[in-house]
Amino acid sequence: MLLERSFYNNNWERFDFVKNTIDVKEKTSYDLNLRISFTEDYPYNDFSMIFTVFDAYGDPYRAKAYKFNLKDSEGQWNGELRDECHTFELPINKSFLIADPGKYTFQIENYMPITPLVGVKELTLYKK
């Protein structure tokens, strides 16, 4: 697990970045996935986020915007139903390379236009 967060009252504020710093000892490659759970209160058909990795100096090492379709054209959820939440396992980056040892901060930014974003229960960024 690289980072995780459960959201108070299932609400995620727009500029409440989810982040964690890890110490990378040697050159490594990760297959990164995001597990995210939504309640029935989530009002949108998709979810947008920005994933950023910062190097030891605080400079952006990699950054990418993502948009995931959560519901079909009729508004039905695509994700697996677990514990009354719709849970998705989403690929973030296959073979994400960190070439130099050091401390790296992984950050996920809610990139949806409305704050707070209602219906987000929890998320976990993990290496496969």
Locations of regions flagged by a protein language model:
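Extended extracellular/luminal ectodomain segments enriched in beta-structured repeat modules
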Residues: 25-32, 101-102
